Amino acid sequence: MAKLSKALLERLGVAAVTEHANKSETTLRANIPVGDKGISFDGEIEVFKDDTESVQSLIGRVPVQVKGTQVQEFTAGNRTFPTGMDHFQNYYNSQGVIIFVVEIKRNRESKVFYKQLVPTEIHGILQEYGIKKGQGQRRIELRPISETDLASVCIKFMNETKKQPLMLIENKPFEREDYTSYEMTSLTFDPSIGNIFEHDFTLYGVKEKLTVPLDHFRIDALKSEIIETIIIDGVSYELFIETTNMEKEVILLIENSLELNYTIGTSKFDFKLKRLHSLAAQLKVLPLVLDLLTGRNVEFVQLGWTFDLSVTEKEREMSKTYKRLYRTMLQLKEVFQQLDVDETTEFGDETIERNKFINQIDIFNKMMLEDDRSNFKVEFPEEAKYIGFNIGGMKFILFYDPYSKPIFTNAFSQNISNKRISVIYNDVETPYTPYTLFDSQSLVCSCNVNITVIKESFNRIDPFVNDEVAYISNDFCLTCIHAFDLSQNEDFLELADYIYSKYQGDTLTPEILYINQTQIKKRREGELSEADVHRLFSIKQEHAGDIGMNFCTSVLLESKVEAKLLFDKLSREEQERYKAFPIYKLYYDMTATVLV
């Protein structure tokens, strides 16, 4: 290919850009001299409101650089071009530039490509590739002008650069959490015709009327959530799917469990069980998997996909494995019904190897459905007791009785709550509830805990009948308050309040009872009534010498400095004891940011 001279390429390049300016419906005036170029910039394009080209009609000026390059054939799609870091710095200092690369054939035909370089993008290039990586140049990607028009390119550039003052880019005046909203813009993306993965975007943080440029990026993936209908050989499944769309691949996460990968343009897909997630998820996806392994045709209705399926020997073997897993999950469904556990409860920790995880479920099923404890060790197996069992992150509380059938039962079933348990005090046996044996962690973390059953168990006893029983009941109420602090489940506050409502005697110190009831109210409502404040103040006056009681009232009255002074007066042992009480949570939250 005979080479054209650099001077000719320059003239032809400028002429091609000028021709686009002259043909624009919006009045553009290209001031791009030939042979007398400045440093980094070749000239400018003026944009006018009308064709008078008067002072009054001038909208603005766009700095430009034009590069002519000879080619044998025009580039299809986008093309790249190298630019030095020193030029990037000059572009940044001048608030951006539009670069034109004009491909020119031997016969003088030309094709114009453009790149709008705005300050946020240039700043990122200088920081990442110039300063951090020490590169001397960086290739930029240019788009064909034929996909748009020069006036639109210039006007969008001017509007975008106005939103990107260098002071905001460099100083980052706010933290991310300070912005009330975010907005995203693109100079080139047209949703009706464009591939979003081929375009650049700028992210702005919005604070009141100010928009602050935060980042310039290209989208790698788009996530969305849909309810999809999948039809396999006429059998229909309606499933929740998280879709991740990438330039060449789509990943579906079905019911947070089954991952399906499809390479765009092919006729096949792969799938795997990424995680178990929950029993509900498995009861939905495993029948789907079995049909995928044995079916002939599958249609994804909303996505518009249709695939022909084939059954290989490998898939037949996989089908056997998934059938066993499905049987295991159906058995677990029966166990969950016994334990009154929600099937949508997530299994939680799935970091252990998949087969070991499933083995845990098999052991649990055999314990609950077959009284088989051969794979579960019970200490002192001759004694009836409450025991715990874990599946991943799920925790269950069971009642174990070696002399009954079944051996393992739900600790919160009506049969268990009716079992006789007693508190012996001064040789007097008093009927009591078994549920005060559980600590706050067990109440919060065990997925078969039934607060209604616990509450009803207190209806069959007097929880404050004597000093010992009252002490246990009060301690359990504090456990319930702590359980609320761990979980934010207000049912625990209601349970504690309900138990306290049964108090009628003289087995508790009235002031302690009132402080604990006020703790519940403080957590529920966030504030106290005027009557509460007066009552707490009276308690402070009546018990001026009781440091612990004064500490509690000061916390509830939000006397931050006084509460800290009183806590510091407690002995080290007393401080450790109070740290285990729910009142300390209120104290800690109140004083966490207070310096004394």
Positions of predicted regions on the chain:
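Short, hydrophobic/proline-enriched secondary-structure or compact coil segments at domain edges
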Residues: 101, 265-279, 473-484
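Charge-rich interaction segments
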Residues: 140-257
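Long, low-complexity regulatory tails in eukaryotic proteins
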Residues: 301-596
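Elongated alpha-helical scaffolds
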Residues: 59-124
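Extended non-globular C-terminal regions
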Residues: 238, 242-342, 346
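Compact, glycine/acidic-enriched structural inserts
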Residues: 115-156
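Catalytic centers of nucleases
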Residues: 4-82
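General N-terminal leader/first-domain-start detector
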Residues: 1-21, 161-176
